[in-house]
């Protein structure tokens, strides 16, 4: 087999080059791979078109809204890699529930701001832009690393009580404060939870059409493929501005893990879903869990959908799940047209 020419495109919140180089150094990787970093999506497509690259790995969020450009270049997504660090981190001396009244927390994600307001009433949750305008200060940032370093200085100076940062960026800058991971699973049923942003830390791999599947499977992961296909099916037609209003979690689960969680939460519906009338387990395959939610700006209202599907059925089941999700949203807006803006 000829040496594979592999390109990567990275952003601070999804350093694809680091992820892929770590994989290439592992025993699971192919031996003959030559990797190089690229500066833009268009450059990567051009390199693929010209035959200078065989494959291109990019953050999935960059591909959103650009799939027509990809198809016109004679390329397609051949697979994806499972997110390693999709959850966000709250940097603060206090856990969220112990924040003082009127504490100031910064986050540049509309979703995260709504989730924080839902979880803790009485705190001020602002974007960096709003904080700058309110305090009439002048700040410009070259990149995300510089922006989060500025937030850390504000926290150390006592001007804010905390800020929310992607886990991977937290590891790249010097932060000495306590950290609290915003997890998607509540400790107890009904407790606070924080679904990740769509495409969070998800890497997709693009190749020319008819690229050998046998090679593609060696570089992609089944769970990553599932996450990409489901999120793309639900969100592919949405405007980019609306993506940040949605929390979306897709993952593979073992039945035993789900049953333990259902027993802990006394969730009889989940316990009975995969057992027959005699109490026997009806499936032994991997399950696909889908959680999606949309929250009003003030955090007081949440619309959500939760499905657990056998892996062999998920590509059919997501068709009805996506229709149900659209109906739920439409019904909510019919009842209250200002649902999201409250």
Predicted regions, residues:
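Flexible hinge/capping segments at coil-to-helix
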Residues: 89-105, 119
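Small-molecule-sensing regulatory modules
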Residues: 1-46, 113-114, 118-342
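Small-molecule pocket liners
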Residues: 75, 84-93, 193, 199-205
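Short beta-strand-centered segments that line the small-molecule binding cleft or hinge
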Residues: 44-87
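Local beta-strand N-terminus motif with an aromatic residue
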Residues: 52-53, 102, 160
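Long, charged, alpha-helical interaction scaffolds
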Residues: 80-82, 101-106, 116-117, 125
């Amino acid at each position: 087999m000829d040496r594979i020419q592999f390109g990567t495109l990275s952003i601070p919140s999804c350093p694809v080059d680091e992820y892929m180089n770590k994989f290439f150094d592992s025993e699971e990787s192919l031996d003959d791979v030559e990797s190089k970093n690229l500066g833009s999506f268009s450059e990567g497509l051009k390199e693929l078109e010209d035959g200078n690259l065989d494959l291109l790995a990019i953050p999935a969020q960059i591909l959103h809204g650009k799939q027509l450009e990809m198809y016109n270049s004679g390329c397609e997504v051949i697979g994806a890699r499972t997110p390693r660090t999709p959850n966000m981190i709250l940097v603060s001396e206090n856990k969220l529930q112990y924040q003082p009244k009127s504490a100031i927390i910064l986050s540049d994600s509309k979703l995260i701001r709504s989730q924080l307001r839902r979880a803790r009433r009485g705190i001020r949750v602002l974007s960096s832009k709003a904080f700058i305008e309110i305090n009439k200060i002048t700040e410009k940032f070259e990149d995300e690393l510089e922006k989060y370093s500025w937030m850390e200085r504000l926290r150390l100076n006592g001007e804010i009580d905390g800020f929310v940062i992607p886990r991977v960026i937290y590891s790249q800058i010097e932060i000495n404060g306590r950290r609290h991971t915003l997890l998607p699973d509540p400790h107890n049923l009904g407790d606070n939870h924080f679904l990740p942003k769509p495409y969070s830390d998800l890497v997709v791999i693009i190749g020319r059409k008819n690229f050998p599947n046998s090679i593609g499977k060696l570089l992609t992961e089944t769970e990553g493929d599932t996450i990409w296909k489901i999120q793309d099916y639900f969100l592919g037609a949405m405007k980019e501005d609306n993506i940040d209003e949605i929390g979306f979690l897709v993952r593979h689960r073992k039945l035993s893990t789900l049953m333990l969680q259902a027993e802990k939460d006394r969730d009889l519906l989940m316990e009975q879903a995969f057992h027959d009338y005699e109490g026997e387990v009806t499936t032994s395959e991997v399950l696909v869990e889908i959680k999606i939610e949309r929250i009003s700006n003030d955090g007081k209202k949440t619309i959500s959908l939760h499905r657990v599907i056998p892996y062999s059925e998920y590509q059919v089941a997501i068709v009805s799940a996506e229709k149900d999700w659209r109906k739920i949203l439409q019904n909510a807006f019919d009842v209250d047209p200002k649902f999201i803006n409250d």
